[in-house]
């Protein structure tokens, strides 16, 4: 297989984005646009990738250094384009960093949805020292370089929109910005570029006419899916590509048998915090209601049901579990697990380290963080469990909390099996509630309690008969 080097154009400012963030670092599906393109390079098993930076170069280069999640073993290098004098000028900056043999593929850092199969077909079209262009036909080609063909349909040149005459502007086949070039020819063609055009820039597309003049065959690999070569220049375009990408992911899930209530209201994203790729693994008969967002790696077991507007990140939901609407499950880096047949929510929050056993119930406005709940444990209303180990069949009352933080350090609470915690209790860690014990409602527990006993720690009730409320003083 011919050695493959890749140049990624990532120097643009993206003025229309109206953002301080460089355009190629705007996020699609939770991942910077540039990371999507680096993933394309990885899919081609590139030997070397050269990223051409300019606006926000320091940020862009740092973001690339944190792109390990894209896969691939390529050698990553950076070059600066300062000033920015066109696409040809950008590639001129990159060529000294290339090996000089094989094939060079030029990609755009703001074109995130090009499929690996499309790029492989482009490289194949460029086999045998040909110049290969990725093209597409558009109903409105305004702004794009037109593919000008000669007799027999052979590609003769690319004319940029601003330099095209009326006849050329009527052409609907356009250049995508992606090409595969024989490396040994590239440097010579770049040396012949001029900026004698309407924009006063060095156009990379001018090498097409040079190839024709030099007798090098030019192949155009034309695709029918314009989304694969769509770039991002504005928030509206970014939103359009986001929805297109999410629709494609939803369609793939439905092909596997997942029931999506509305595929237009489904999101699967990378987790920017943990770096986990957006991935959802579903067993049979999984149901997902509208408006759900999944980030990082999520597993849904057989028959799991996810209610409307849930956000689930880096978590495993086991078979038969039901997550009711508006629940937030966030495993971040340590993960979260919901056991078989568990009932979660609505409006529940599971934070990193939440590990729930079979048939656990976590109800509305209950928060669980870094805690394990054994099979059959229940916390149904308005409660907090942090840094706790909860035994089987525990019933944890409404309004109860574990006070796990002393202002400097976290401490654990152990609630053994078959304990009943009354409403509005405070368990001040470190503390252990013995198996089978009961804690009376309203208690503040600061010491370990014995198994099987009743523990009450609250002020004694006083009732005053015939008590009269104070009368309001007259105004005046």
Swiss-Prot record:
Q: What one GO molecular function would you report for this record?
A: glucosamine-1-phosphate N-acetyltransferase activity
Q: Which reaction does it catalyse?
A: alpha-D-glucosamine 1-phosphate + acetyl-CoA = N-acetyl-alpha-D-glucosamine 1-phosphate + CoA + H(+); N-acetyl-alpha-D-glucosamine 1-phosphate + UTP + H(+) = UDP-N-acetyl-alpha-D-glucosamine + diphosphate
Residues the record lists as binding Mg(2+):
110, 233
Spell out the residue ranges making up region: Linker: 236-256
List the Gene3D superfamilies: Hexapeptide repeat proteins, Spore Coat Polysaccharide Biosynthesis Protein SpsA, Chain A
Keywords assigned:
Acyltransferase, Cell shape, Cell wall biogenesis/degradation, Cytoplasm, Magnesium, Metal-binding, Multifunctional enzyme, Nucleotidyltransferase, Peptidoglycan synthesis, Repeat, Transferase
Q: Where is this region: Pyrophosphorylase?
A: 1-235
Active-site residues, record numbering mapped to chain: 381
Protein name according to UniProt:
Bifunctional protein GlmU
Gene from which the chain derives: glmU
